[in-house]
Each structure stands twice: as C-alpha cells, then as structure tokens.
Amino acid sequence: MNSKEIRKSFIHFFENKNHNFVRSSPVVPIDDPTLLFTNAGMNQFKPIFLDQVNANHTRAVNSQKCIRVSGKHNDLEEVGVDTFHHTFFEMLGNWSFGDYYKREAIEWAWELFTKEWKLDKQRLWATVYEDDDEAFDLWTELTDIDPSRVLRCGKKDNFWEMGETGPCGPCSEIHYFIGDDLDKQESSGVNVSDQYWELWNLVFIQSNRLPDGSLEDLPAKHVDTGAGLERIATILQGKTSNYDTDLFLPIIDKIQNIAGSSYTCLLYTSPSPRDSGQ
C-alpha cells in the first residue's frame, strides 16, 4: 500500500465505525498559548476534553500534521539517530468524546492492524500502564495476542500527558519488531531497543493535570489515539527506514538530481537520548 492508500484506509475504517472525519488543524495552534506548534492530533480537541466546549460529534477520525521540535514532546534529538523519528510527521488518530473507551479502542486497533492490514502478530507487542488492570485484561480477553507480549510499564512510557498541564491519562502502546530474526525478540527490548517501533498509542484521557501538579478527574472519559503514518508505511511497504518509503523518496530523488549526488542513509554514531537514559 502506498501512503495515500494507508491514510485513506485508516480514515475509512473508522468512518465505518461511525466516526466523523475532521481535517488536520494548522501546525501553529489557534488560541492555545501553551503550544508553539501542534504536536499531536488531540490539540484541536483540547477544549472538548476540558469540557470548555461541546463536541459536535462523539467520535472523530483524522490525519494530523505535527511538528515536534521543543517542549514535552520533543523528537529533535532523535532525528538522524534512527530512521523513524522526524521533526515533522503525520499522525493518524481516532477519538471518542465521552463515548466508547478502552474496550473498543483496543479491539479496533488490533482489528485494523491484524485483519485489515495483516501485520504479523508474531512481531507485535502491547504495553499498558503498570496499574491499568482493565487494559491488561482487555488485551488478553478481546484479542488473540500472546499474553506474554502484553507488558506493564511505568509512567515514563505509559502515562500520556500533553504538556506540563492539561488532559492526561494511562495509555496502551502497540510496538512492532523490525528485526530479521523473530527468535531474538525479548520483552526487555520494548521501549529500549530501536528494533521495536512504537506504531500506535491508545490514550485513555480521564484526568487534568493542574499547575500545582495534582490531578483532577475530567467530567467524562475520552479516547485519543495516535499512529505514525510514516512508520506504518515503512512496515506495509516492506522497508526498514521511513526514508525509503514513498513519503520521502520523491523528495530525496529531487534533491539527488539537483545536487548531482547519490542518496546514502548514514546515521549518527553518537548514542540517542533513549540509549543514554536521558
């Protein structure tokens, strides 16, 4: 599948589950002084999560253009270190505004990945927040994932917060092993090794982080998911680098023609912040 087909497939999948398509919002947020750039698909829905406005619909799907170069969600130091982080990327997402919650989010994500796109189940891993027994049980009851591939992780990896303040909650991530040897997979590699790519983050927004650091319950529980189009395109197109997909190659080919030089993928040898524990 090319990138346009993947984007269209994602949107149609959720439209068929009664989601309303919402266009990508500007990369410079409107009326949100807490953000320099739009860094996630949920930014435009923040007033809904905070109960400041009423939602026009209870379910939404879109593909959001994002920039991450500063703040809490900053990928700048990862760019060039690996082949799957970018300052600009496209986030596929589906949302529930006080409608469905964890059960549907998990079930539909697995359905899309394994039935529609037919990703190899033997390469997929799921993580949940360490205290989220509900999400853990749903993964093992609703899907046919190997229970040993459902991992409990801490706040750093599985409690999502948009910024220092604002909507937040536990999350469940789906990771994909891109290595050559399936037998070399280990649970200890998830969230650590670059052989395991985070493809989709299912966020269960139920709290609001206040300036003093405390949490208050939101008036309703919501679902906010984000999946990287570039990474999914890499997997579905049988590549090992985002730069070798149809999203980047036309640009690279044009640069080659102008520069009169051939493209070679060379990564920095310095350790990434992930490897150095930062």
Residue positions per predicted region:
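Active-site-adjacent structural elements in folded domains
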Residues: 216-219, 266-267
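Conserved, charged catalytic cores of large soluble enzymes
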Residues: 100-155, 175, 179-181, 255-262
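Hydrophobic (often cysteine-bearing) scaffold residues that line and stabilize catalytic clefts
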Residues: 2-6, 102-105, 135, 248
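Short acidic (Asp/Glu) and glycine-rich catalytic loops that position anionic groups and cofactors
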Residues: 86-90, 117-119, 211-214, 229-235, ...
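Internal glycine-rich alpha/beta core junctions
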Residues: 177, 191, 224-235, 239-263
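Class II aminoacyl-tRNA synthetase-like tRNA-binding/catalytic domains
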Residues: 1-97, 147-214, 221, 237-240
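Conserved small/polar residues in nucleotide/adenosyl-binding loops
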Residues: 268-275
